[in-house]
Amino acid sequence: MSVASRIRDKLKNNLESSGGHSVVTSGTKVIRYRAGQRPDYAEAEDDQDSHFSNIQNQKSIKEAETNDPRLARFKNRSSNQDEPQSVEERKASRRRHHDDDNDNDTTTTTTTTTSRRIQKTEIIKEDDDNNNNNNNDTKKDHNDDDEDDDRRRRAKERYLKKKEEEEQKQKELEEKQQPFKDIEGESEEEGSSEYETDSEEDDEDEYWDQPPIFRPTFIKKDDRGTIKTDEQWEKEEQEQQAQLEREKEQRKIEAHRKLKDELDRDRKEQEAKELEQKEEEEYDDDEDQDGSKKLLWIQRELERVRLEIHTRLLAEFEKKEFARRRAMTDDQILKEDPSRSRTNIDNSQKKQLKFLQRDYHRGAFFQDDEYIKNKDFSAPTGEDKFNRELLPKVMQVKNFGKAGRTKYTHLKDQDTTEKDSLWNTNYNNKKKYNNNNNNSNSNSSNNNRDYNYRDRDNRS
């Protein structure tokens, strides 16, 4: 039943009890509705719900009690206390309890065990041979019970023995701590008896676990070791100074030792190098019997030394000469070295080139180099060394037989006086222009001459 239906039924009952009048308008009290306010009849509904929940809880408790195997065993045990049980029944109940403890079975297991017990009793009544087996089983069960009792008894003895050992250790510990208790006994007597409670033993255990506290004693100033006199301070300073001196001396000794080790190592390395060099000198496969190789070696060394000296002296001379000429003027340089002047260049050294010979320019750089300065650049090189005038007329061209060959050799064998040549196309126009200019210049000169004559006559 939903909450809305219960509310409708409640309102309907109230209307019927009030004779068909509204609950809100009946009586002097006016019931007003407010948003969020719980109505009066809601309390009754809550009570019903709580009653219903209590009933459900009671049912669940009863079900749990019925399903609990321990309660079932207790009920069976209490119900069977007045009835004398046989050996078979005790055995069956023990087996049933054992199965319940191991498997945590429900009441269904209990019912099955009871039914099993009934079947066993019937089998015992029907068959006499099984009685002997059951008797043997009962004997075994009794023996098992005796073993369990012995095991429990031994465990209890071990527990008691262990407890006695702990008590004995505690007594020995208290005897060791007894002197400290006597020292602190006087201060404890001053305390009130309100602290003597059940927790006193625990407090004492915590207290005795802490290190002992001794009573402070007064020591005279002269007997104290914390206050130092002037003599003690001076003695400590002297000891510190002596310690510093010892450390300094130790460092000096260590430095000397390291230096000695370094020198010894260098000496050993030098000796090893000398020994190796000596062995190399002694071991010579190519021995010089007549001394010719040694003479050649001496000559090479002399030449090398001479070249080094010459190079060094030449560098020094050039450096000085450069500094001297740098301070001179251009006129002084030309007077000192007239060969450098352009007017004194000798063109007679230039030779006549061969037929179809290439002409190489001397260049404008590296003129100070003796090799470049004295070299004859007009001398033929390569293919120019051959006389090409001896070749046939067809082969007297440049790059004969190559893709870059030319039709003409030079302008000497070409007629440059042709009228239809490119350089003669404007010759007639130039000649006409020059003639016209000459005529105009001659006429102007004649007019000037006549004017001069007339002027002279007039003045005369």
From Swiss-Prot:
Stretches for region Disordered: 1-291, 411-460
Per the record, a Pfam family? MFAP1
Q: What is its main location?
A: nucleus
Compositional bias per record (Basic and acidic residues), positions renumbered to this chain = 1-13, 60-71, 162-184, 219-232, 244-253, 259-276, 411-421, 451-460
Q: Where in the cell is it found?
A: Nucleus
Oligomeric state and interaction partners are given as:
Component of the spliceosome B complex.
Function summary:
Involved in pre-mRNA splicing as a component of the spliceosome.
Q: What is this protein called?
A: Protein MFAP1 homolog
**What taxonomic lineage is listed for the species of origin?**
Eukaryota, Amoebozoa, Evosea, Eumycetozoa, Dictyostelia
Gene name for this UniProt entry: mfap1
